[in-house]
């Protein structure tokens, strides 16, 4: 069986597909992946052929934070959809299945090309609030003002549906017409299918009934056995467990690193700062802080006092599995949902708003560093399942058929 995996999102969208790719290859499938150019080195590490798709996310992450306008989003989605129609046909040639993850814009063109080529298409999402449901409010549309507080959940989803048609309807209709396909009636169902997979843990992100027939596989996490660097090992051994601070592949709030380090120091704790794609820097050269680039979070998070992060699905799952108390400073998309879940489970704190202050982080650290939070985090860690990618591979083989010719893993 030959499988094309595709996303045009951040590192958090790519890593689950890496885990799925490894599981599929272990079962004899041939896998290739369309992903942003930033991910070339990561895919080379696991031996998955990489076909660049989408823009590099690094310049945006490192740039000054600017609110996205509706015009920005329309331009981005038009370019993204056009790029999918341009590049996916060649990438999907000879494939027996296509699997996509990410936001809606990452899926629409891919689904249409798969439809044209007659290739089975599957979509996976990482957060319950991504699919229409009476139980979850959707993430607010990027570039648009928030809805009035107290708006009914169904009204919020209708608002999102209208926003999706404004953004995606015209460019999708135009591209589909160019290859002889009719317009789509339901933007969400077209991208997500009527039977999507949710790649998230059942405890951390329990799936309530949705308008689509979704199935929860568990999180797609690839076990990471890379050792920590000798320099980081020496730092960890030189004192009490530090607090980890990082915002992954996203833009960080202004002065977030400086403010957070001041708050962490005020609690008498040391700091490990992940530079991330925003290229965060230490405020000084004191020996109580250690800055790092790419690191094995699965190993590191088991050795820290707490984890301060943006609340993306991947980082939240890794920190939860490690039993580390968390402080989530959510910015966009799935992050507010995961911040709320961490607080509900008693394994950390959901920061109120996207911009931390010394006072807000100091209060959050008081809770996160409390012994009872650590006890609760360690208890929940033991309930997180680790075989979601294997379950998804089983679903794919069952849906497409075991009779497809296998290739060496």
UniProtKB/Swiss-Prot annotation:
One of its GO terms (biological process) is lipid glycosylation. CDD domains: GT1_Gtf-like. D-glucosyltransferase that acts on the aglycone core, transferring D-glucose to the phenolic hydroxyl of OH-Phegly(4) to form a devancoaminyl-vancomycin (DVV) intermediate in the biosynthesis of glycopeptide antibiotic vancomycin. Also able to glycosylate A47934, an antibiotic with a teicoplanin-like heptapeptide, but lacking sugar residues. Pathway: Antibiotic biosynthesis; vancomycin biosynthesis. In A.orientalis different glycosyltransferases are involved in biosynthesis of the vancomycin group of antibiotics. GtfA (AC P96558), GtfB (AC P96559) and GtfC (AC P96560) are involved in biosynthesis of antibiotic chloroeremomycin, while GtfD (AC Q9AFC7) and GtfE are involved in biosynthesis of vancomycin. It comes from Amycolatopsis orientalis. Gene3D superfamilies: Glycogen Phosphorylase B (3.40.50.2000). This is Glycosyltransferase GtfE. Keywords: Antibiotic biosynthesis, Glycosyltransferase, Transferase. InterPro entries: EryCIII-like_C (IPR010610), Glycosyltransferase_28 (IPR050426), GlycoTrans_28_N (IPR004276), UDP_glucos_trans (IPR002213). GO terms for molecular function: hexosyltransferase activity; UDP-glycosyltransferase activity. Belongs to the glycosyltransferase 28 family. Its EC number is 2.4.1.-. The keyword Zinc-finger does not apply.
